[in-house]
Amino acid sequence: MNITVYHASCAEVKNPSVDVNGENLGFGKGFYLTNSKAEAEAWARKIAAENGKDANPIISVYEFNYFKTKNVGYRFNEFETYNKEWLNFVVDCRKGKDVTADYDIVIAGGLDNEIADIVEDYENNNITAEEAVEQLRYNDVKFQICILNQEIIDFNLEFVEQLTM
C-alpha cells in the first residue's frame, strides 16, 4: 500500500537525496516529507520567503511504499505523540549528536513555529522537559518523515508530480 507524501522546496525534486538537508534539523540529516499537503504548502511558502522574492514555492509529490519499507526490515524510529523521548531526540538531533545512526527512517511529529518555540525554550533551560511536554500535548501532531537511508528513497519512493503554488 502506497501513501502519498509531499516535499516542500523552491525546486522540483525528482531524484531526492538524503544529503540534501542539513545535519542539525529536527530529525537529523535526511530527506524530509510530510503526509499533509497543507503542511507541505505552509513549508514551501516559508522556504520560498526565506530564499527571496524570485523563489517560488514548489511541492514535489511522491508515492511512498510504507508497508514494504516496514516489512523489509529497515530500522524505524516512530513517535506517535509529542513526549519526553521525542523531545530529547529532537534536541539531540538539533545539537548535531549522532542519534540517528541506528535508524533508516524517522516518523514523528514535526516542528512548526509553535512546536519549535517550545523545543527552544527547553533547549535554553527556560522550561523543564515536563513543562515542555505539557505544552506540547495541546498541539496536534503533524507527522513528518525523515528518510535517512538512500536505499529507501531509491526503491520505495516514486516521484508523481510537481505542484507550483
Please state what every model-predicted region is.
Residues 2, 25-26, 41-42, 46-165:
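Conserved NAD+-utilizing ADP-ribose enzyme module
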